[in-house]
Amino acid sequence: MQRLRFSSFTWILLSLFGLISCRPEPPIEPVEPAEVAPLTDAEQVIADALDGMVVPISSTPFDITDTDLQVLDYLADTKIVGLGEATHGTREFFQMKHRVFQYLVEQHGFDAFLFEMDFAEAMLFDRWIQGEIEGDLRSMMRDEMLFWTWKTDAVEDLYTWMRDYNRANPDKRIHLYGVDTQSPNYSLKELLRRLELIMPTTADSVRFYIGSDYERMLDLYNSKDQIAADRIQNSLEEVRKVIEEAKNAIIRSSSEEAYAWIERLVTHMEQVEAHSYQYFVLGQGPLRDKYMADNTRWLSDQMPEGSQVALWAHNYHVSNTFTGNLFNDSQGGYLRQRYQDDYQIIGFGMNTGRFTAFNRGTLKTNTIPTVANRSSYNYLFSHMQNKNFILRFDQVTSSDADAWLRRAKPFLSLGAVYQAPASNYYYPIILTSMYDVLIYFDNTGSTLLIR
């Protein structure tokens, strides 16, 4: 299996964004929270009310029963369910997303898991899930995955479960798809692989026009090389012409569906270029979320009518954040605008514990020993009797609790990079505006990365 190759600068760049794989020490016992001040009387009333409305769950996601998850049965007919994560390195979040997806598949017939991973990168792993290729999954993840965030035992367990499910249910197969647009490497390789199978001469034409600049894009764009950018943009225009001119021949040699996927790979290459140019050359906000939403829509449309999918991404990406500003709107915001209530959002929260993230350039297990923000949602949740729970906001019947949830408050949110103090990572949001459901674990452990 050919490994993806990145230049030295690209590896440095990916490291800064927390994307290189290595392995922290294994998760250890839960963090012992430091003593914190009690709630006020008014806050205690809210905490008590919420305790009566949440579904208590185990701190171990795979011990959570189907009965516990019946609170999510209202999602039975939902087209897309977003599953967030408050950090990119929390084991309970990853395992819980597996558990929820398993429930949605087994109880409600969901068809696919869309991932915050490269569009074409996911195709390789879906072929493994479908049984089309063999090989050791752990080795594939170590060698072929770009982001360290997904190179975990929890994701390995999820993909293994999906493959096992397909073996047991060949007439109701589930799929893995990617929606992200950060790497120039995967889509070109996948485009050429597909063309080689049905139209080798068209593959040769793509190679002729694309040259070597496209795969070196991140290096060239980081150096603000406008001449190279012009070459890359022109080459992509030529590649699109080649594919469109070969459309009828591709369909005759294969199918309309095959052409649709080939054309979409070209679209994805264009997305990666536009996002990279906007971000690195122009220094403007990223276009990722807009494109991730568009890829989610396209993938959903490609599936049979009535298909349902879950979406794995960070809390921010799945959230309903839509202002009309291209650079501030989230993937979930675009999806809510398009699908309205047919897109439902499950956010994740935590109080204390360990998580994996880059800290001063080193990928390591980090610790939050106590809630840092007295006015945060997390602070009150940490004082509830039920330490781990599922809360549907549409089932909040207490007026005091409802009003409290609808007021903007800080909420802990980490990505792939962390540097203490934790108070730097609390952002004011309105929980009920951004999410429909909250899954909360009071004390968490870090992900276990694959070497």
Language model features with spans:
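Structured catalytic-domain cores with a bias toward divalent-metal coordination
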Residues: C22-R451
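Bacterial N-terminal signal peptides that target proteins for export
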Residues: Q2-T10
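Bacterial N-terminal signal peptides
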Residues: T10-L19
